[in-house]
Amino acid sequence: MKETLINIAKAYVGESQARNRYTFYAKIAKKEGYEQIAEIFLTTAEQEKTHAKRLFEHIQELKANDEELKIEVSVPAVYGTTAENLKAAIAGETYETTEMYPTFSKKALEEGYEVLGKRLAAMAIAEKNHKEKYENLLKNLEEGTTFI
């Protein structure tokens, strides 16, 4: 089995987890009175769902017929205040931007998956946008300039 298939499965699981965490984080932000942050968590969750769907489609293209993929994954378990959740989201998006997607893109290209390699590189850019958005929200929250 090619390494790219395993990488895509890991990315799919990561995006699926992020989507769920962000919906959980949105509820906390809303409960704490941060409507803007809650909305951005929800919007980003939908974007992560789109990423997961595309990755799942790539799994279908690369896997054998009834193949079940077994992978090892980490589960980020931060579930705290809005500030703590933003920090956790920033850490996750930073990993995807600086390590995961660049590494997966390079491997896909090495294995001859040019379109997939380019798509993974593009996903790194999208994740960088998420990271920057969360960094700005955290900065505003820490400075007390967040809309409530």
Task: Indicate where each model-derived feature is located.
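Non-heme di-metal
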Residues: 1-148
